[in-house]
UniProtKB/Swiss-Prot annotation:
Subunit structure: The COPII coat is composed of at least 5 proteins: the SEC23/24 complex, the SEC13/31 complex, and the protein SAR1. Golgi apparatus membrane; Peripheral membrane protein; Cytoplasmic side.
Keywords carried by this UniProt record: Cytoplasm, Cytoplasmic vesicle, Endoplasmic reticulum, ER-Golgi transport, Golgi apparatus, Membrane, Metal-binding, Protein transport, Transport, Zinc
Gene3D superfamilies linked to this entry: beta-sandwich domain of Sec23/24, Sec23/Sec24 helical domain, Severin, von Willebrand factor, type A domain, Zn-finger domain of Sec23/24
Membrane topology type: Peripheral membrane protein
Top-level taxon: Eukaryota
Reported function: Component of the coat protein complex II (COPII) which promotes the formation of transport vesicles from the endoplasmic reticulum (ER). The coat has two main functions, the physical deformation of the endoplasmic reticulum membrane into vesicles and the selection of cargo molecules.
Sites where the protein binds Zn(2+): C207, C210, C229, C232
Cellular localization per UniProt: Cytoplasm; Cytoplasmic vesicle, COPII-coated vesicle membrane; Endoplasmic reticulum membrane; Golgi apparatus membrane
Biased amino acid composition, Polar residues: 11-22
GO MF assignments: SNARE binding; zinc ion binding
Name recorded for this polypeptide: Protein transport protein SEC24
One Pfam match: Sec23_BS
């Protein structure tokens, strides 16, 4: 095998009318939008700034005079790929997305409206999916600290669907755009991976009337002795500790306070914010020990994974507690005897009225009982290796777990390979064949089959208990019903269909995800409240939690890998140039501190529809429409949910054509839309073809699991889940798959020098369409859950040799597998592809481990025994379903979808 880089054949493209291929790439790989002549002629007509007016001092030209995504997003070439991967370090840091204007008169120049004809932008410019939202442009003096670059929250934490807020409800209604906030309070699984500033004392200054927290947008009065609330306008006293430290006797500068400088901040809470002292972190593991779980290897894999993860459980204060319950048709408790290494197994067979068989020793301190816990986890599988018990009494086990930890709170972590089939909460297999593909499918198969699970979940929430599910059965498990447990307790459902320990890749995925799940620095006993300026009301809440009151969301434990959406309504006319939003999470940390994480957002207002459209965030809009489509599917039907998504696109296009197309020219294309929204139609179209909504027959467990993911994924993962990312590996540049080279200035010499970073360069994505493919290519598909490596049927033999170590295409392993590992010297191409896969799998804000599926495409030379392999055919169809721009099954292509839209909008 040669390590020499091969020159693989390059695909040749024909640049048709309106092709994006002729557009020069922007540094860093983001493609410059391609505008037609007709649009360029309309640019000044669409401006909301007088073209004769001089540029406003302090206003970046990208926001006032260039197309969305052009000058604003040109990043330095060396580090551009990382430019939009900002994490917590940028949470309160400098941002080019939030701008303050200087010397503003009456008219505030906001983002400019540019029009795109969707029918002329095929294939759609997918580089837009990597861009941040349109900038938020604030008037001068909005922030207490002049020209602060850290006052507004980064979109990774807190973003709005509209970065200009309508001044009245009629304008919002007229726009057909949703008004909602997307909140993701945490952006890494571990505390140390974030850089959110924390107050140095327990002084918390809040408005006496609206209870808003002091923030970078307040104003000072009476020589700095009082602050005026930016939410309700009330004057409040500045705490004396802001200016004088009584302990050290030193004078302080109040303008140095982190809460006055940063959009995202954590307050250390005093005792009055505690209903009780912060509780220890608690994990009660409910483990399926029935014959299904034992034979599939779940029981052994989980106990080994927990054993290997004990050091990763957050336990800085040495107070973490654990308990274990084995479940078949009986409940098997494990009592730890103080001072002894061993444990007792206590079996309760009365599942109708389950009870705790011992008053102590069931829930124990992990640190103090470490040896006994380790021994139990080593011996655990042997207790059940000869079982023939087919029962699984999940309901009674949950009630026992609740009884065990209800005085403290914590987590019930359930591992199941069996449908609950005995005791309270018993479920049965539903008749899918009779309703699949019919309007009543959702209500019959996706609704809860037993009210126990929701009512129990609500009880858990009030007891500060979260429930997490890891479901691994190869047969029906009723994910739709069971997912009520995590949905109302701020947990999550994890679904592993046909899982078996005989497959190393299955074991790797489950083990990594469980281990990362246990290692999260979760917050405990948390509540989320979002407040807005006068005239704005929080009307609907979406995500995994329970609404304790009209505006208070309750989280027994607060996960770090989910996001939440709050829909808003405008109750009163807004007569101020800026409105404010504040999200606050009161919680206990895993290391025993009571804290409040506060996120602040200021957004300008306008009475002009073009301002609203020019600043709309297409990714946040996709997020809220996804939640509302799920709501429609569960309350009505899947066809209604798909119609909802299509109708939203039609409504928005109709408004744009009627109200915003320059001069409303007769005969103008009905598919014109603002450039910053040009990917919204394909995202909503792709959503109709998603596993959760598509019209084709889908097993109800798979559909329910997909809807669970759609309802909790943060925006970057949600977008990829809807519109998968595809990379062409056979044509990638030489630097892809290798560490990125950066140029930096040596502080001592002042000279530029090249530095090798740890960041792996990824290829530029291509469109989700076979028209972007070559029949001799190699493609990597990332759909946020799995990775597909597509090896085309006419692939170059040398490429197969370099990647797999054989030139026989049909000798390579297909299906769920891993690539052979060759060193850089043995095969540079293999090394680079594995580096790319490793980079895609690498994340610090999600526990998901993406399995790799190798798929060999068909060809005219394919042996008949290969073409008759049902598993391979199914695998090809699965991978093809990721190409959402193409016609798949009964679903139309994106081009056909646009044609249908044109008819509907023209009516």
């Amino acid at each position: 095998m040669s390590s020499k880089r091969r020159a693989y054949p390059q695909p040749s493209y024909t640049n048709g009318p309106g092709s994006q291929l002729g557009t020069p790439p922007v540094a860093g790989g983001f493609q410059q939008p391609n505008y037609g002549v007709d649009q360029l002629n309309q640019q000044f007509q669409g401006m909301n700034v007088d073209p004769n007016q001089a540029a406003v001092a302090g206003a970046p030209q990208a926001a006032a005079g260039s197309p969305y995504g052009y000058n604003q997003y040109q990043q330095p070439g060396a580090n551009a790929n990382a430019a939009h991967q900002s994490r917590a370090g940028n949470a309160a840091g400098a941002s080019s997305y939030y701008l303050q204007q200087g010397n503003i008169n009456a008219a505030l120049p906001l983002n400019q409206l540019y029009t795109t004809d969707l029918s002329r932008e095929l294939p759609p410019p997918i580089s837009d999916l990597s861009l941040p939202p349109p900038p938020i442009v604030l008037p001068a003096g909005t922030t207490l600290i002049p020209n602060s670059e850290t006052a507004n929250a980064q979109p990774e934490y807190f973003r709005s669907t509209l970065n200009v807020i309508p001044t009245n409800s009629s304008l919002l209604k007229k726009s057909k755009l949703p008004l909602a906030l997307v909140v993701k309070p945490y952006n890494a699984l571990k505390v140390e991976q974030e850089d959110v500033p924390v107050t140095s004392d327990t002084t918390i200054s809040r408005c006496r009337r609206c209870r808003g927290y002091i923030n970078p947008f307040v104003t000072l009065a009476e020589n700095g002795r009082r602050w005026r609330c930016n939410f309700c306008n009330l004057l409040n006293d500045i705490p004396s500790s802001f200016e004088y430290d009584e302990i050290s006797g030193t004078v302080k500068n109040k303008f140095d306070r982190v809460e006055l400088n940063n959009a995202v901040v954590e307050f250390i809470a005093p005792k009055e914010y505690m209903a009780r002292a912060p509780q220890p972190i608690v994990y009660t593991f409910i483990i399926d020990v029935s014959i299904n779980a034992v034979q599939s290897g779940l029981t052994g894999t989980i106990t080994r994974t927990i054993l290997e993860s004990l050091d990763r459980i957050p336990n800085k204060t040495k107070t973490a507690r654990v308990a274990f319950i084995g479940v078949d048709s009986n409940l098997h408790y494990f009592r730890f005897n103080e001072g002894l290494d061993g444990t007792e197994v206590l079996i309760v067979s009365d599942i109708d009225e389950p009870f705790l068989p011992s008053p102590d020793g069931l829930l124990v301190n992990l640190d103090e009982n470490r040896q006994a816990v380790e021994k139990l986890l080593i011996d655990f599988p042997s207790y059940f290796e000869d079982t023939a018990n087919q029962g699984f009494a999940l309901g009674p086990a949950l009630k026992s777990g609740h009884k065990m930890i209800s005085h403290i709170g914590g987590k019930l972590v359930c591992f199941s390979a069996t449908l609950p089939n005995i005791g309270e909460g018993k479920l049965s297999v539903r008749d899918e064949a009779s309703v699949s593909g019919k309007p009543k499918e959702a209500k019959t198969l996706l609704s809860s089959a037993d009210s126990f699970y929701k009512s129990f979940a609500v009880n858990c929430n009030s007891s500060q208990i979260s429930v997490d599910l890891f479901l691994t059965s190869s047969s029906y498990q009723d994910v739709a019903t069971l997912s009520n447990l995590p949905r109302f307790t701020a947990g999550q459902s994890h679904f592993y269909p046909a899982w078996t320990s005989a497959k190393n890749e299955d074991v790797t995925k489950l083990s990594k995800e469980v281990s990362d799940h246990l290692s999260q620095d979760i917050a405990l006993e948390a509540v989320l409240r979002v407040r807005g300026s006068t005239g704005i009301r929080m009307s609907s809440f979406y995500g995994n939690f329970f609404n304790r009151s009209s505006d208070l969301c309750s989280f027994p434990t607060f996960p770090r890998d989910q996001s939440y959406v709050i829909e808003m309504s405008i109750e009163e006319n807004i007569n101020k140039p800026v409105v404010y939003f504040q999200a606050a999470v009161l919680h206990s940390t895993s290391f025993g501190e009571r804290r409040i994480r506060v996120m602040n957002l200021a957004i300008p207002t306008s009475s002009k529809l073009n301002d609203i459209y020019a600043s709309a965030d297409q990714l946040a809009i996709t997020n809220i429409f996804t939640h509302k489509a799920i709501e429609t599917a569960l309350s009505s039907s899947l066809p209604d949910a798909r119609d909802f998504l299509v109708n939203k696109v039609v409504d928005i296009l109709n408004v744009y054509k009627k109200e915003l197309v320059a001069g409303n020219v007769s005969g103008a294309s009905p598919l014109q839309l603002s450039t910053n929204l040009r990917m919204l139609p394909i995202l909503l179209f792709s959503l109709t073809k998603h596993l959760g909504f598509r019209a084709d027959r889908v097993p109800s467990d798979h559909r329910a699991a997909a809807l669970n993911n759609l309802g909790s994924l943060p925006i970057p993962y949600l977008v990829k889940y809807i519109y998968p990312t595809v990379y062409a590996l056979h044509t990638m540049p030489d630097e892809c798959g290798l560490p990125e080279k950066l140029i930096q200035v040596n502080e001592e010499t002042g000279e530029e020098e090249e530095v090798i970073s740890t960041n792996i360069m990824l290829p530029e994505p291509i469109n989700d369409s076979k028209s972007s493919w070559e029949n001799y290519g190699l493609y990597l598909i990332d759909n946020s859950s799995e990775l597909f490596l597509w090896v085309s049927g006419n692939v170059v033999p040398g490429l197969v040799q370099d990647l797999f170590g054989t030139d026989n295409l049909y000798a390579i392993p297909t299906g769920k597998t891993e690539l052979p590992e060759f060193s850089d010297e043995e095969s540079e191409f293999n090394f680079r592809v594995r580096q790319i896969i490793g980079k895609i799998r690498e994340n610090n804000d999600s526990i998901v481990w993406k399995n790799l599926y190798v798929v060999v495409g068909g060809s005219s030379n394919e042996p008949i025994e290969i073409s008759q392999q049902r598993d391979l055919m199914a695998l090809r169809m699965w991978a093809y379903s990721c190409l959402v721009e193409d016609k798949t099954g009964s679903e139309p292509s994106y081009r056909d979808f646009l044609t249908n839209l044109k008819t509907k909008v023209s009516q």
